[in-house]
């Protein structure tokens, strides 16, 4: 049986590995900018100007990277 592809994890992992600057839009419209330093099933660790923020995924609306991210869809 073929493994299902987890696009979210691939996307976040590429952002983390490539140190891609990203803008996070929260559900309340607030924007956070920085680098993804880590993530798990429920949270994303964002670093901005040397300070870390742990954001719950259920509060995030959109990830907008500064450049396109290459991920494997097959």
From Swiss-Prot:
Signal peptide: none annotated. One of its GO terms (cellular component) is cytosol. GO terms for molecular function: RNA binding. Residues 9-69 form the Sm domain. GO terms for biological process: regulation of DNA-templated transcription; regulation of RNA stability; regulation of translation, ncRNA-mediated. Disulfide bonds: none annotated. Keywords: RNA-binding, Stress response. It comes from the Bacteria. InterPro entries: Hfq, LSM_dom_sf, Sm. Belongs to the Hfq family. Homohexamer. RNA chaperone that binds small regulatory RNA (sRNAs) and mRNAs to facilitate mRNA translational regulation in response to envelope stress, environmental stress and changes in metabolite concentrations. Also binds with high specificity to tRNAs. This is RNA-binding protein Hfq.
């Amino acid at each position: 049986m073929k493994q299902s592809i987890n696009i979210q994890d691939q996307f976040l992992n590429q952002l983390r590995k490539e140190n891609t600057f990203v803008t996070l839009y929260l559900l309340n419209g607030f924007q956070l900018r920085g680098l993804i330093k880590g993530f798990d099933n429920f949270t994303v660790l964002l670093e901005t100007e040397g300070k870390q923020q742990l954001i719950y995924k259920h509060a995030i609306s959109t990830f907008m990277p500064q450049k396109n991210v290459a991920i494997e869809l097959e």
